Amino acid sequence: MHRVMLNSKHRYSIALCVVLIYISALVSLIIQPFAMSELNPSYIDFAKQLPVADFGPTAPIVVSPGECFTGTLTGDYEIKYIYLWTIKGEELKLLNYSLKFEKISGSTLRICVPEEVDNGVYDLELVADNAQYSVPRSVWIIKQLDNKLRVVVMSDLHFGAGPVNVTTGDINRYSAAVLATSLNPTLILWAGDIADTASESETRLAQTYRYMMLYSYPVLGVPGNHDHLGENYRKYLGPTRWARVISNKTLVIGIYTTPYFIENNVITWDEIVFLEEALRNYSYVPYKIIVTHYPMFYYQGELITRYDDESLQPYTQGSSTPVSSYWSGNMTAFRYVLKLIEDYNVTAVISGHIHVDQYVKYTSTRTNTTTYFITVTTAAHGSSTYQGITVFDLDLNTGELMFPVKPPGFIGFNNSTSRSASNSVPVSIVESKVIRAPLFYKLSVYNRASWYTVNASTIMVLPWSTSLEKIQIRQGSVNNNAELIISKHDVIGDRLFVNILMNIPPKTSAEVSVSGIDDTSPPRIELTGKKYSPPVPVLNKTLTLYFKVTDDAWGLDYSNYVFRYNGTSIKVEYSPQTIMTDLNEMYLTITLTVKGVNKTLTILEIYVEDNYGHSILRKYGIIFYPAGVTPVEDPVFEVIETTSPITITSPPITMVTNTTTTGTTTYSTYTSTSTTQTQSTPTAITTSLTKPTTQTYTTSPTPTMTITTSEQPASTSETKITTSTQLAIQQPTYTIVLTGIVVVTVVIVVIALYIALRKKTS
């Protein structure tokens, strides 16, 4: 038996290895709890640039099992293998297929799908040596199709804007998605103006929204004038023109009719050439649909005419022509495209842009063909009528066009002197919101209609980073007969898949939330470091106060705020207003003006709730002084009263918490018919906010004084109040700091051991 003798160099090398292993284990133990609670990806970060040029989330390739298609790469990628994957059905079944491919030119690939692939919309994954590139919701596999094609049309989504502010636009967009899924479409069409300013952030939000809210449905869309130049549109949504054949029965063509900077021309001849070639190449397909942003007609009702009829004159102010002003600048292009529509017996032309409904039944006296021109109102932006989406069924045996849901006021293709109609289903009937904080989401749906029931099973996909075992689900119904239930959920990569069952009868509402952390504390309200300006509140001049409202867990409830000044409620304007961000931190900028001549004490009350139901009220005394007076007290101070509890009565809820047993997920469930929670806080808080007539406040060193509220206004004091709000997102600084400390410690230890080793071996 041999004894191995180690010299000092070997001993120090072994010691160094042991120390490094120990440090690695320690780092792993420290980091793991924090890694499991990393913040979810933001909506903008969730969206990725497309690696291909000829298909994408709003222009998926349509193929049958065993067929091949081509794709043009946008970069110099050395692709090693390609696969498709999707999540399907109420059981969230994962489908995954490897694809054969070959390079047929410098950047063009020929990709073939296997015979055994199932129906559905898929993500295409391109894998290189050191990277993976995703084309989300970009391949639509059709084995067989029903004899009815149900189409939902959404136009003018205007991400980044809304009819009043961005928040109202966000609510309309979420409502449109929930309404669309409840209609169970075969296909969804987007008719342009997806972004509001064509910015990268707006277009990335659109990609995330398309993935998150409309996951199971194919979406075919075109850009509009607000997506001008289309560069960001191409980067994140797909090509600006395309032709897709659906099951050899329906041809859908998308063209870009809104290039800016082309004088008196709504369409380029390149687009017309593309349209004509597509119609000619697929002339054998029985039914044809064209999607374009600008409508060819500005009219409501029936037209019996032909492309070269002299009655089709360009629009001029005061004229009665049915030709839209947008195409009137180039009547040659208008007549040429209309002739193509007649020659190839186009079934329908879908448009948007004008933010109202206009339906035209066009019958050609030359070809004896009928084409339906359907122009739809905006889904989310301002409108002279309302926001809505359109749904129609196309019978693939007869070509008949039918409307399965007709809202009150529906007139179809009947003539109307108002040149508009109310044919779309209003998105406001299903008011829906998705609220998120860094580790929290809540979907709420309120069915305002008396004539429509929301009934659907749909998959939502949430950007996610927490493990499956930490997920908590809370689902509740404001009305006992309304259901909004997460029946199944699973985490795959950086996304949480949830199957949601919706059954919400008229005039009922429900909500469901999912979180990765507990919420055990109420929000916090504080003056920021800036506090207020000027440093002395002066009568008859503007005072601006800066507040920060924070909730670290489930975030702030944007529907439950109360702001009162001198006992009178204040309607607060938020800027910017959006709910497509983390709502865990908010900055308030409140501007106040008090008119008068004498030193005046006023009271500002701020009440907020979080998404769990915790609430907090803060009262601030604000003293206004005559000009030139130097105060001896703090002019802005918190009013401290006797501690009292908050009482919150919650609607019936069902809590679902996950526990893991031998690799399988089990559920522990409890149900309460009424929940009351009590919290103690260091300040007096009452959720009733009952307005008193007279209040007396004593502070030190402020002398006792009496203020009179707006019910008994002082003769020398008149209050004018304006407010604004700014949002901010909390950063995960705890993880950054901890990681920095650990890294620095490791570096120092390694350097010290290296120096010691050098000394021993020298």
Feature locations, PLM:
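N-terminal active-site segment of His-dependent metallophosphoesterases
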Residues: 50, 59, 75, 115-201
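Long, low-complexity serine/threonine/glycine- and acidic-rich segments characteristic of extracellular
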Residues: 101, 106-113, 482, 491-493, ...
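Extended active-site neighborhood of metal-dependent phosphoesterases/phosphodiesterases
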Residues: 127-138, 202-287, 316-319, 336-342, ...
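Beta-strand-enriched, solvent-exposed domains that form extended recognition/catalytic surfaces
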Residues: 31-145, 423-524, 541-549, 553, ...
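Binuclear metal-dependent phosphoesterase catalytic core
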Residues: 356-461
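Secretory targeting signatures
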Residues: 1-37, 642-643, 649-650, 654-762
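Proline-centered linker/hinge motifs at extracellular inter-domain junctions
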Residues: 51, 411-413, 520-527, 535
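His/acidic metal-ligating clusters that form di-metal
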Residues: 180-187, 263-364
